Amino acid sequence: MAGAKEIRSKIASVQNTQKITKAMEMVAASKMRKSQDRMAASRPYADTMRKVIGHLANGNLEYKHPYLEERDVKRVGYLVVSTDRGLCGGLNINLFKKLLADMKAWSDKGVQCDLAMIGSKGVSFFSSVGGNVVAQVTGMGDNPSLSELIGPVKVMLQAYDEGRLDKLYIVSNKFINTMSQVPTITQLLPLPASEDDELKRKTWDYLYEPDPKALLDTLLRRYVESQVYQGVVENLASEQAARMVSMKAATDNGGSLIKELQLVYNKARQASITQELTEIVGGASAV
């Protein structure tokens, strides 16, 4: 019965692992709902900022802010939003693959790339594959605040202000639903014109009080910050959804493995009983 004992031990081990993955699935489901609430709460502000900025990009401005002007592209920057923890399926690696493809496209044109990392998984990945990481922040937890994210954002905006960057993108996962999270690369600077057909058909003229430069300086920075924060909370909701799905798959796979091991155990036990009966019958016949 040595084989049967070993199989029983494996079954017990898988059952213990199954309890852990089930608990992690339930925790991820709870955190996902909270993340979705935060995402829904911040989305109206981010969407409204995007519309206001879209009006500005299509407008006839008396003061042309540097964030609204296209430049010859020599260096681009990416604000990369990844997770701090693993066990969330291919969420991070799919994002990194898309980013690497975009970086290669720029590199083929002779354009250099800078990276500002949000999340430890991005830091560790680009430490191994290589990349010019100029800023990073990790360990933000499940309820990040804008003050925790502002470091990398300031670094990239300063580089853009000083002419060391000519384009700035945010790279994150867009939350569609529990089963779908899409890696996206969105241009932040220079400010892209709105894709809204209604805005394209209109000409917008603005009067600024008291000073257009001061107003636009503040407004455009708030726009970048709002888009980065929205990207982070959507990525967090995507992380919890991906982890919940991964842990459910692990729990289900554990159940299938237990059934297979139970079948092997039953066969081994049956073979052992048959062997014992054969030995008893053989001994009786000898007597």
Swiss-Prot record:
It is found in: Cell inner membrane. CDD domains: F1-ATPase_gamma. It is a peripheral membrane protein. Transmembrane segments: none annotated. Signal peptide: none annotated. InterPro entries: ATP_synth_F1_ATPase_gsu, ATP_synth_F1_gsu, ATP_synth_F1_gsu_CS. Keywords: ATP synthesis, Cell inner membrane, Cell membrane, CF(1), Hydrogen ion transport, Ion transport, Membrane, Transport. The keyword Cell inner membrane applies. PROSITE patterns: ATPASE_GAMMA (PS00153). GO terms for cellular component: plasma membrane; proton-transporting ATP synthase complex. One of its GO terms (molecular function) is proton-transporting ATP synthase activity, rotational mechanism. Its main location: membrane. Pfam families: ATP-synt. Produces ATP from ADP in the presence of a proton gradient across the membrane. The gamma chain is believed to be important in regulating ATPase activity and the flow of protons through the CF(0) complex. Belongs to the ATPase gamma chain family. F-type ATPases have 2 components, CF(1) - the catalytic core - and CF(0) - the membrane proton channel. CF(1) has five subunits: alpha(3), beta(3), gamma(1), delta(1), epsilon(1). CF(0) has three main subunits: a, b and c. This is ATP synthase gamma chain. It comes from Citrobacter koseri (strain ATCC BAA-895 / CDC 4225-83 / SGSC4696). The gene is atpG.
